[in-house]
Amino acid sequence: MFITFEGLDGSGKTTIVQKLVEKLLEKKPALSFIVTREPGGKNVRESEKIRELILDKESRLSPISEALLYTASRRIHIEKVILPALKENKLVLCDRYIDSFYAYQGIVRGLGLSFAKQLTEMVIESTIPDITIFIDITAEQSEYRRNVSRLISDRLDSESLEFHKKVFDAYKEVINLDPKRFIIVNGLQSIPEILDEIVEKLFQNKKFDEWWKNN
Protein backbone atom coordinates (compact mmCIF):
# COMPACT_ATOMS: atom_id res chain seq x y z
CA MET A 1 0.00 0.00 0.00
CA PHE A 2 1.56 3.24 -1.21
CA ILE A 3 0.27 6.53 0.25
CA THR A 4 1.73 9.91 -0.64
CA PHE A 5 1.22 13.30 1.01
CA GLU A 6 1.05 16.57 -0.89
CA GLY A 7 0.47 20.23 -0.10
CA LEU A 8 2.13 23.61 -0.02
CA ASP A 9 5.15 24.23 2.21
CA GLY A 10 3.93 24.89 5.73
CA SER A 11 0.88 22.65 5.35
CA GLY A 12 2.19 20.37 8.09
CA LYS A 13 2.74 17.26 5.96
CA THR A 14 5.84 16.06 7.77
CA THR A 15 4.25 16.31 11.23
CA ILE A 16 1.03 14.74 9.99
CA VAL A 17 2.84 11.74 8.51
CA GLN A 18 4.64 11.12 11.80
CA LYS A 19 1.46 11.47 13.86
CA LEU A 20 -0.51 9.29 11.45
CA VAL A 21 1.99 6.47 11.95
CA GLU A 22 1.44 6.74 15.71
CA LYS A 23 -2.34 6.48 15.30
CA LEU A 24 -2.10 3.51 12.95
CA LEU A 25 0.29 1.72 15.31
CA GLU A 26 -2.27 2.15 18.09
CA LYS A 27 -4.70 0.18 15.93
CA LYS A 28 -2.14 -2.37 14.73
CA PRO A 29 1.11 -2.50 16.77
CA ALA A 30 2.68 -5.03 14.36
CA LEU A 31 2.12 -2.77 11.34
CA SER A 32 4.98 -3.06 8.84
CA PHE A 33 5.71 0.35 7.31
CA ILE A 34 8.31 2.84 6.13
CA VAL A 35 8.24 6.64 6.05
CA THR A 36 10.20 8.37 3.32
CA ARG A 37 10.27 11.64 1.36
CA GLU A 38 11.08 13.37 -1.91
CA PRO A 39 13.35 14.76 -3.09
CA GLY A 40 15.75 12.40 -1.39
CA GLY A 41 14.62 9.27 0.38
CA LYS A 42 14.98 7.21 3.51
CA ASN A 43 18.71 6.58 4.02
CA VAL A 44 19.47 6.95 0.31
CA ARG A 45 22.84 8.71 0.06
CA GLU A 46 22.71 9.34 -3.69
CA SER A 47 19.19 10.80 -3.64
CA GLU A 48 19.99 12.95 -0.62
CA LYS A 49 23.01 14.44 -2.41
CA ILE A 50 20.74 15.37 -5.32
CA ARG A 51 18.28 16.87 -2.82
CA GLU A 52 21.03 19.07 -1.39
CA LEU A 53 21.90 20.33 -4.86
CA ILE A 54 18.28 21.06 -5.80
CA LEU A 55 17.46 22.91 -2.57
CA ASP A 56 20.76 24.76 -2.14
CA LYS A 57 20.11 28.52 -2.16
CA GLU A 58 23.26 28.96 -4.23
CA SER A 59 22.07 26.60 -6.98
CA ARG A 60 21.13 28.27 -10.26
CA LEU A 61 19.22 25.64 -12.20
CA SER A 62 17.24 25.89 -15.41
CA PRO A 63 13.77 24.29 -15.25
CA ILE A 64 14.89 21.36 -17.41
CA SER A 65 18.03 20.76 -15.31
CA GLU A 66 15.96 20.86 -12.14
CA ALA A 67 13.43 18.42 -13.62
CA LEU A 68 16.12 15.95 -14.66
CA LEU A 69 17.68 16.06 -11.20
CA TYR A 70 14.32 15.38 -9.57
CA THR A 71 13.72 12.51 -11.97
CA ALA A 72 17.12 10.93 -11.32
CA SER A 73 16.58 11.23 -7.57
CA ARG A 74 13.12 9.66 -7.90
CA ARG A 75 14.41 6.67 -9.86
CA ILE A 76 17.09 5.96 -7.24
CA HIS A 77 14.49 6.37 -4.49
CA ILE A 78 12.11 3.94 -6.19
CA GLU A 79 14.81 1.33 -6.77
CA LYS A 80 16.30 1.46 -3.28
CA VAL A 81 13.33 2.23 -1.04
CA ILE A 82 9.83 2.21 -2.50
CA LEU A 83 9.82 -0.92 -4.68
CA PRO A 84 11.57 -3.16 -2.12
CA ALA A 85 9.08 -2.08 0.57
CA LEU A 86 6.06 -2.61 -1.66
CA LYS A 87 7.32 -6.06 -2.66
CA GLU A 88 7.33 -6.90 1.06
CA ASN A 89 3.73 -5.60 1.23
CA LYS A 90 4.68 -2.83 3.65
CA LEU A 91 2.76 0.40 4.08
CA VAL A 92 4.82 3.11 2.34
CA LEU A 93 4.16 6.70 3.44
CA CYS A 94 5.95 9.28 1.30
CA ASP A 95 6.15 13.04 1.92
CA ARG A 96 5.80 14.39 -1.65
CA TYR A 97 6.00 12.38 -4.86
CA ILE A 98 4.94 12.73 -8.49
CA ASP A 99 2.15 15.27 -7.95
CA SER A 100 4.61 17.82 -6.58
CA PHE A 101 6.66 17.29 -9.72
CA TYR A 102 3.65 17.80 -11.97
CA ALA A 103 2.62 20.98 -10.13
CA TYR A 104 6.04 22.59 -9.65
CA GLN A 105 8.00 21.49 -12.72
CA GLY A 106 5.27 20.63 -15.18
CA ILE A 107 2.98 23.61 -14.65
CA VAL A 108 4.65 26.38 -12.63
CA ARG A 109 8.15 26.03 -14.11
CA GLY A 110 6.56 25.88 -17.56
CA LEU A 111 7.89 22.55 -18.82
CA GLY A 112 4.38 21.38 -19.59
CA LEU A 113 2.32 18.77 -17.81
CA SER A 114 2.59 16.38 -20.74
CA PHE A 115 6.40 16.53 -20.68
CA ALA A 116 6.50 16.09 -16.90
CA LYS A 117 4.23 13.05 -17.12
CA GLN A 118 6.29 11.48 -19.93
CA LEU A 119 9.50 11.98 -17.96
CA THR A 120 7.89 10.53 -14.86
CA GLU A 121 6.40 7.50 -16.60
CA MET A 122 9.89 6.56 -17.84
CA VAL A 123 11.14 6.04 -14.28
CA ILE A 124 8.25 5.13 -11.97
CA GLU A 125 7.07 1.95 -13.74
CA SER A 126 4.02 0.81 -11.76
CA THR A 127 4.78 2.78 -8.59
CA ILE A 128 1.73 5.02 -8.75
CA PRO A 129 0.30 5.89 -5.32
CA ASP A 130 -2.77 3.99 -4.20
CA ILE A 131 -3.89 7.07 -2.28
CA THR A 132 -2.66 10.66 -2.16
CA ILE A 133 -3.56 12.84 0.81
CA PHE A 134 -3.60 16.55 -0.02
CA ILE A 135 -3.37 18.93 2.95
CA ASP A 136 -5.28 21.95 1.70
CA ILE A 137 -4.04 25.41 2.71
CA THR A 138 -3.78 28.58 0.62
CA ALA A 139 -0.57 30.28 -0.49
CA GLU A 140 -1.19 33.08 2.01
CA GLN A 141 -1.54 30.59 4.85
CA SER A 142 1.60 28.82 3.66
CA GLU A 143 3.59 32.07 3.72
CA TYR A 144 2.31 33.00 7.18
CA ARG A 145 3.21 29.62 8.66
CA ARG A 146 6.64 29.57 7.05
CA ASN A 147 7.40 33.05 8.36
CA VAL A 148 6.15 32.27 11.87
CA SER A 149 8.09 29.02 11.98
CA ARG A 150 11.07 30.53 10.16
CA LEU A 151 10.87 27.83 7.53
CA ILE A 152 12.48 29.99 4.84
CA SER A 153 15.42 27.66 4.72
CA ASP A 154 16.01 26.58 1.13
CA ARG A 155 15.72 27.73 -2.46
CA LEU A 156 12.07 26.74 -2.90
CA ASP A 157 10.95 28.13 0.46
CA SER A 158 12.31 31.54 -0.50
CA GLU A 159 10.14 31.80 -3.63
CA SER A 160 7.60 34.64 -3.77
CA LEU A 161 3.98 34.55 -2.64
CA GLU A 162 2.98 34.76 -6.30
CA PHE A 163 4.99 31.61 -7.01
CA HIS A 164 3.23 29.70 -4.23
CA LYS A 165 -0.16 30.94 -5.49
CA LYS A 166 0.69 29.40 -8.85
CA VAL A 167 1.68 26.16 -7.14
CA PHE A 168 -1.65 26.09 -5.29
CA ASP A 169 -3.56 26.50 -8.57
CA ALA A 170 -1.33 23.91 -10.23
CA TYR A 171 -2.09 21.37 -7.51
CA LYS A 172 -5.81 21.82 -8.11
CA GLU A 173 -5.26 21.16 -11.80
CA VAL A 174 -3.26 18.01 -11.03
CA ILE A 175 -5.89 16.73 -8.59
CA ASN A 176 -8.57 17.09 -11.25
CA LEU A 177 -6.63 14.70 -13.51
CA ASP A 178 -7.12 11.79 -11.08
CA PRO A 179 -9.60 12.87 -8.39
CA LYS A 180 -10.45 9.37 -7.14
CA ARG A 181 -6.86 8.88 -5.95
CA PHE A 182 -6.94 11.96 -3.70
CA ILE A 183 -8.16 12.49 -0.17
CA ILE A 184 -8.40 16.26 0.37
CA VAL A 185 -8.14 17.42 3.97
CA ASN A 186 -8.75 20.90 5.38
CA GLY A 187 -5.31 21.97 6.59
CA LEU A 188 -6.70 24.82 8.72
CA GLN A 189 -7.86 22.39 11.38
CA SER A 190 -5.79 21.43 14.39
CA ILE A 191 -3.38 18.51 13.93
CA PRO A 192 -5.64 16.14 15.94
CA GLU A 193 -8.64 17.14 13.81
CA ILE A 194 -6.65 16.64 10.59
CA LEU A 195 -5.51 13.20 11.78
CA ASP A 196 -9.04 12.16 12.73
CA GLU A 197 -10.28 13.19 9.28
CA ILE A 198 -7.47 11.33 7.52
CA VAL A 199 -8.00 8.12 9.51
CA GLU A 200 -11.75 8.24 8.93
CA LYS A 201 -11.34 8.75 5.19
CA LEU A 202 -8.63 6.10 4.90
CA PHE A 203 -10.88 3.43 6.37
CA GLN A 204 -13.69 4.57 4.10
CA ASN A 205 -11.36 3.91 1.16
CA LYS A 206 -12.05 0.40 -0.15
CA LYS A 207 -8.48 -0.21 -1.33
CA PHE A 208 -6.94 0.79 2.02
CA ASP A 209 -9.56 -1.03 4.07
CA GLU A 210 -8.96 -4.29 2.17
CA TRP A 211 -5.18 -3.95 2.51
CA TRP A 212 -5.50 -3.25 6.24
CA LYS A 213 -7.70 -6.30 6.85
CA ASN A 214 -5.32 -8.59 4.94
CA ASN A 215 -2.04 -7.41 6.51
From Swiss-Prot:
EC number: 2.7.4.9
GO terms for biological process, alphabetical: dTDP biosynthetic process; dTTP biosynthetic process; dUDP biosynthetic process
Presence of the UniProt keyword Kinase in the record: yes
Highest taxon listed in the record's lineage: Bacteria
Binding sites annotated in the UniProt record for ATP: 7-14
Catalyses which reaction(s): dTMP + ATP = dTDP + ADP
Enzyme class name: transferase
Name of this protein: Thymidylate kinase
Species: Mycoplasmopsis agalactiae (strain NCTC 10123 / CIP 59.7 / PG2) (Mycoplasma agalactiae)
